[in-house]
A protein has these predicted regions:
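Zinc-coordinating Cys/His ligand positions in small cysteine/histidine-rich zinc-finger domains
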Residues: 172, 176
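Active-site-proximal cap/lid insertion segments
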Residues: 1-170, 182-190
Length: 195
């Protein structure tokens, strides 16, 4: 979280994705009140907030009111401010992860209810990894280990044993041939990737 970039190249030292300098109070941390958001029409959060129905705005305000008050009362600086910003960012990130998890559960329950769970290929993946405080960074712009590691979970009982893992390197271009293979369709010879 407090990497000083000693011995790292220029790109790492001059990057624009540090929790300390780049994580914004408005867009990233949602530290604006309703009045502040609606007053500044140049703020990119304004257009998102303005499109929300009033009842959703009320929920938004309620969800972030304590954070805003805590921030304004705290007068944090240096490492204390970095730590606080990191905690708020992770709180939002983990809330997103929880929402994804809950909705995957809803999907699995529905597929089971209609009798299609074991006949459905379920894939959980992402386009890239993400910095969650490593090196003092957030976001996903550098070719470091954290950004190269992507989740790839496939559930398909007809072809994959539950709980199995693989150390094989895979890429997004492998998805199409894999799905064609699962479906019993011949993979064209000119397609990129491998099943």
């Amino acid at each position: 979280l407090f990497d000083d970039y000693e011995g790292r190249g220029k790109a790492a030292r001059e990057q624009d994705m540090s929790i300390e300098h780049t994580l914004t109070n408005d867009w990233d941390l949602k530290l604006l009140t309703r009045e502040e958001m609606l007053k500044d029409t140049t703020n990119r959060l304004y257009s998102v907030y303005k499109r929300m129905p009033v009842e959703v705005q009320d929920k938004w305000d309620s969800a972030y009111a304590q954070r805003i008050a805590e921030y304004r009362k705290g007068d944090l600086k240096g490492k204390a401010l970095i730590s606080w910003k990191y905690q708020q960012y992770m709180r939002d990130y983990l809330a997103t992860v929880l929402a994804v998890d809950e909705n995957i559960g809803r999907l699995l329950n529905y597929l089971e209810k209609i009798g299609e769970l074991d006949n459905t290929i379920i894939v959980y993946t992402s386009d890239q990894g993400f910095f969650l405080g490593e090196h003092g960074w957030f976001d996903k712009r550098f070719m470091y280990e954290e950004c190269q590691r992507m989740p790839l979970i496939i559930r398909y009982p007809k072809a994959i044993k539950a709980g199995s893992t693989s150390n094989a390197i895979s890429m997004n271009v492998d998805f199409a041939p894999t799905f064609l293979d699962f479906a019993g369709v011949e993979v064209p010879s000119d397609i990129q990737g491998a099943s």
